[in-house]
Design a protein with these regions (language model features):
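Accessory nucleic acid-recognition modules appended to NTPase machines
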Residues: 1-115
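Short, flexible loop segments at the rims of nucleotide/cofactor-binding pockets, characterized by
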Residues: 2, 124-126
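Intrinsically disordered, low-complexity Ser/Thr/Pro/Gly-rich regulatory segments
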Residues: 62, 89, 174-180
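Short small-residue beta-strand/loop micro-motif enriched in glycine and branched aliphatics
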Residues: 67, 120-121
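Short catalytic-loop micro-motif centered on adjacent basic/acidic residues
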Residues: 98-99, 121-124
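Structural motif
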Residues: 118-120, 146
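Catalytic cores of nucleic-acid endonucleases
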Residues: 126-166
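Helix N-cap / beta->alpha transition motif
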Residues: 162-176
Length: 180
């Protein structure tokens, strides 16, 4: 367990070792969503395991909870879903995702990626709850060509938003290319 008040710099060598071994991936926070993305990286980051199965196994979560759902499992379901999407973005789409959060952390977009000369925000939802307040805040502030939400809901395209089902993430690049 981590000691209270621990900071990322306290674990810098361990984190680098896990990255070098390919066991974790870091998704870097952007100070500003602009091209090229790495130029606007700041010190914040999220860590994801190599595989969503590892996260499930490490959590000690009972398989029945995963299959049937459980109220006690609802918060962790979001973490598992975000892990799955991070894995899909890297492996299936070959993208290097970043993330964005507002200055006072009033809004956060789970992933931000570049395709061609466009930036796309991607919000992840574990259920069919389609409220994406942070995504709307981002859209209103930065006016991307399209905002993307991936959830358990069906494929749906609206004026400013594409809902791409979690099982359809392999189509992400093709969907973005149709806009260019």
């Amino acid at each position: 367990s981590l000691r209270k008040g621990a900071r990322a710099k306290d674990f810098e060598l361990a984190i680098q070792w896990l990255k070098d071994c390919g066991l974790i991936d870091q998704v870097i926070r952007l100070a500003k969503p602009a091209i090229p993305l790495p130029a606007y990286a700041d010190n914040g980051f999220k860590m994801f395991l190599l595989d969503v199965g590892l996260l499930g196994a490490m959590s000690g979560l009972d398989a029945q909870s995963l299959l049937k759902g459980n109220e006690l499992f609802s918060e962790f379901k979001g973490a598992l879903t975000e892990q799955y999407v991070a894995q899909q973005l890297r492996s299936e789409s070959g993208l290097t995702p970043f993330y964005w959060s507002a200055e006072r952390a009033t809004a956060e977009v789970d992933f931000l990626f570049q395709q061609g000369m466009e930036l796309y925000p991607l919000e992840v939802k574990a259920e069919e709850n389609l409220k994406a307040k942070s995504l709307k805040v981002y859209f209103d502030k930065f006016q991307p060509r399209l905002a993307i939400r991936s959830s358990m809901s069906d494929y749906r395209r609206e004026d400013w938003l594409l809902n791409l089902p979690l099982y359809g993430l392999s189509r992400l690049i093709q969907e973005c290319q149709t806009l260019q």
